[in-house]
Amino acid sequence: MARITPIARYRNIGISAHIDAGKTTTTERILFYTGVNHKIGEVHNGAATMDWMAQEQERGITITSAATTCFWAGMAKQFDSHRINIIDTPGHVDFTIEVERSMRVLDGAVMVYCAVGGVQPQSETVWRQANKYKVPRIAFVNKMDRMGANYLRVVEQLKTRLAANPVPIQLAIGAEEKFTGVVDLVKMKAINWSEADQGVTFTYEDIPADLTELADKWHQHLVESAAEASEELMDKYLGGEELTEEEIKHGLRQRVLNNEIILVTCGSAFKNKGVQAMLDAVIEYLPAPTDVAAINGVLEDGETHAERHSSDEEPFSALAFKIATDPFVGNLTFFRVYSGVVNSGDTVLNSVKDKRERFGRIVQMHANKREEIKEVRAGDIAAAIGLKDVTTGDTLCDTSAPIILERMEFPEPVISVAVEPKTKADQEKMGLALGRLAQEDPSFRVWTDEESGQTIIAGMGELHLEILVDRMRREFNVEANVGKPQVAYRETIRSIVEQEGKFVRQSGGRGQFGHVWLRIEPMEPGGKGYEFLNEIVGGVVPKEYVPAVDKGVQEQLKSGVLAGYPIVDVRVAAFDGSYHEVDSSEMAFKIAGSMAFKEGFMKAKPVLLEPIMKVEVETPEDYMGDVIGDLNRRRGMIDGMEDTTTGKTVRAQVPLSEMFGYATDLRSQTQGRASYSMEFLKYNEAPNNVAQAIIETRRAK
């Protein structure tokens, strides 16, 4: 089957924003204007197409990023039909993992900001992730019809808070309830959308007289930015010649693709204004799969560099970026095709696990409605039903041309709770449910505590775990009691020691003999976390026994020495020892390694590390003193303060253990007028008195 839409007319984009910037509403409007659904779903009625899990509709927040396909030929039908694949990403900080995954498979992004709230904390996180994957982006300043809306203030914040280089391609005509349309700064015309047909038709008009001066100033800024794209445009501009509309657009597109500028548009999705022009900007300025550099990977040996270009002619390669459980068909694996073609029924290789998988059925999702398709090609995003053993980040490729595309890296969870099934019947279902959820979400871990026998689940924040427990109840009918949240502490050391470990059992018959010297030293935090070096020379310990020493050390790392928390950032070198011809065994050396590490660890100035969170509180000025005082009481370090339209933003670093129940306390301190967000920042050494208390509590158990 031939390709229906040429790959140059594909746009794979993400729509990304802070909670309440109106991102889901914006996506709904896109689906409406591109003719997919004929009745607009409002988020505050709980009817939006993209938010399809029951909890999302209740809480009004987006949790899973649904992928959707639509077609757009421009608001004046000025383009050939373009295929836009949209990935809707969640805005809550406990779900940054979802955002990270989507960024990985996108070619471009639309960042939605609220005209009142501006650039909020989560926007910064998403911005950093987009920078990490070098995703070209444009901004849409939404909610221009709301009280306190100020478009140019948001443009300024993009510069100051995100260190971006914003270039507005539109100006707002009026604001708040007087917001009527936008000025197109490229064409230098005003755009007015018809209210009668929900903004489907529009007219170009002259720019209102009170805006002409401002429009000229920003038009100049825009032309200058476009001219910087190439020497020939610059020469033409400096020579005093007018740049044509085509040249301006071409220059801006080049600079967006190079991540040098971010174009800013505005509107009100709720009032059906501006989304149409933003869609045109997606087509004109964001990249097609062919505009993006080839994706990098390695061959089977794990070292040889290889790449795949966006072309149907190259061998098939795709990246699984999300696993979802669907009530009707079981596992859905969302994947992005980077090169080649695959048909339903084909067998492909999961090169990360080295297992073959058969594509049973392939579906394309429109929010949670699905359409079966027979084939997918380079640039497509689709979901496969029935893949057995694929997890997020795995590569699917042609069996005759294996390649491993870059793996995604996922953060370690920082908070854990114990869950207990309420009845015997729940117990069996719970294991299955947790397994499914962990497969879908790599930032969620499940394990059994060996001492207490309890099932422990860990994730990125309180809301993350609440929603997982809630999903367990709704989707799998498992009722569970949830314990108090526990902090994921870590242990490490501060000095270097050398330590001997000797395990000898010789009392007639076959004995045991293992003897090893280890050097234990601290490593830079944030690196590999653990490294083992074999420095044994002259065969004093035969090399087949050295891996056993490493294994002994690694077992000890899992449950630390100080208080049983995992040990991180240590380097261990085996440099000496001895063995016995008959009595030595792997088991003996494993125990010797474990003993040496345990003793050495306690001599190497062991310390307890605690997770530190980056906290931002937005509060009316009257409560500022109380909020700061409270953060100080929680051992917080204030990083800085900023004025916002509604008061002040306080930024601080606070240990996670002090943040439990903060939402309730903050509400009572500020009569519910303040809001906060937090995300994991780093691990820091816990102060002595805190560490002692934790160690004693753990030992008492």
Swiss-Prot record:
Occurrences of domain tr-type G (ranges): 8-290
Protein residues bound to GTP: 17-24, 88-92, 142-145
Keyword Heme: no
UniProt keyword list: Cytoplasm, Elongation factor, GTP-binding, Nucleotide-binding, Protein biosynthesis
GO cellular component labels: cytoplasm
One GO process term, biological-process aspect: ribosome disassembly
Stored InterPro entries: EFG_II (IPR041095), EFG_III (IPR009022), EFG_III/V (IPR035647), EFG_IV (IPR047872), EFG_V (IPR035649), EFG_V-like (IPR000640), EFTu-like_2 (IPR004161), G_TR_CS (IPR031157)
Top-level taxon of the source organism: Bacteria
Matches recorded under NCBIfam families: EF-G, PRK12740.1-5, small_GTP
Protein's name in the database: Elongation factor G
